[in-house]
Curated annotation (Swiss-Prot):
NADP(+) binds at E82, G130, S131, G132, G133, A134, M229, G252. Pathway: Metabolic intermediate biosynthesis; chorismate biosynthesis; chorismate from D-erythrose 4-phosphate and phosphoenolpyruvate: step 4/7. This is Shikimate dehydrogenase (NADP(+)). It catalyses: shikimate + NADP(+) = 3-dehydroshikimate + NADPH + H(+). GO terms for biological process: amino acid biosynthetic process; aromatic amino acid family biosynthetic process; chorismate biosynthetic process; shikimate metabolic process. Keywords: Amino-acid biosynthesis, Aromatic amino acid biosynthesis, NADP, Oxidoreductase. It is an enzyme of class 1 (oxidoreductase). Belongs to the shikimate dehydrogenase family. It comes from Chlorobium phaeovibrioides (strain DSM 265 / 1930). PANTHER family: BIFUNCTIONAL 3-DEHYDROQUINATE DEHYDRATASE_SHIKIMATE DEHYDROGENASE, CHLOROPLASTIC, SHIKIMATE DEHYDROGENASE. Signal peptide: none annotated.
Length: 290
């Protein structure tokens, strides 16, 4: 008798572009697991509670959660992991026989490709571009694993930003990077690591050809690590400019794979077959760029 198929899925809004089904279904197939991963587009925030209630009733095995619902699901779950509590955001849900537990694998996923550089980051300043949910995971990872001397957050309008109120984090305006003599420019130039946590440079967006760091600014240089969370295309305008300047570059695909592997482990207690998944993802991203 065949075991029933376990259903996993991605909760989000207008997320048909996601590579998560490819990642997880490739892993399930490689390990011959009776599991399937699909997409659940939820059009309105108030419907998320109904979706989770239905998941309990139907016995859906687990979920990934993406924008704009990473914080929406928090009060709707039965418990949270320590990582999810620390930033009050969930990107992975495990259904334990009707008990929904929220986790956050973005923190570990973000940290994974930076770990080989940990010693060179400790005690030095870092910069994060963007103030959305992705930046929260980066901040928590830096604080708990890398101990930089200072974290500077570059945002569109620091005066109106209400989410990032921690006095230990320096806040600057992204627009000031266009002024060569500004404090913002100096802070970015001095940063050991620069993280792009904005969607600028993503394939298909109006700003796909742009970098969040102005190309003419000469702020990127040898000795820096430039990490772009954007995973499609592999070589974003920011990474191309950073490589030209002699910096070490980390593409967003590394975070995508690492956080996906952590979620897979939570759901199955197994390690994701990374070589097969990476190959499938590279083929898909390469095809989408043609």
């Amino acid at each position: 008798m065949r075991p029933a198929t376990k259903i996993y899925g991605l909760i989000g809004r207008a997320v048909d572009y996601s590579y998560s089904p490819l990642i997880h279904n490739t892993a399930f197939e490689q390990l011959s697991l009776p599991c399937r991963y699909t997409i659940f587009n939820i059009t309105e925030e108030h419907l998320v509670a109904d979706a989770l209630k239905g998941a309990r009733a139907l016995g859906l095995a687990g979920f990934s959660v993406t924008i704009p619902y990473k914080k929406t699901v928090v009060p709707l779950l039965d418990s949270l992991s320590e990582e999810a509590k620390s930033i009050q955001a969930v990107n992975t849900i495990v259904n334990h026989e009707g008990t929904l537990v929220g986790h956050n694998t973005d923190i570990a996923g973000f940290a994974s490709p930076l770990l080989p550089h940990a010693r060179s980051i400790q005690g030095r300043p870092v910069a994060i571009l963007g103030s959305g949910g992705a930046s929260l995971a980066a901040i928590e990872a830096f604080r708990t694993l890398f101990m930089p001397s200072e974290i500077t957050l570059f945002m569109r309008n620091p005066a109106k930003e209400t989410r990032m109120t921690d006095p230990a984090i320096k806040r600057c305006a992204l627009g000031d990077l266009r002024e060569s003599g500004s404090e913002s420019s100096a802070l970015l130039r001095d940063a050991a690591v620069v993280i792009n946590a904005t969607p600028v440079g993503t394939l298909g967006r109006p700003d796909a050809h742009m970098s969040p760091v102005p190309a003419e600014s000469n702020l990127l240089h040898q000795g820096q690590i430039i990490y772009d969370m954007v995973y499609n295309p592999l070589d974003t305008p920011l990474l191309l400019a950073a490589r030209k300047a002699g910096a070490v570059t980390i593409p967003g695909m590394e975070m995508l794979l690492a956080q996906g592997a952590a979620a897979f482990r939570l759901w199955t207690n197994l390690e994701m077959p990374m070589d097969a998944v990476r190959s499938a993802l590279l083929n898909e991203i390469g095809a989408s760029a043609i």
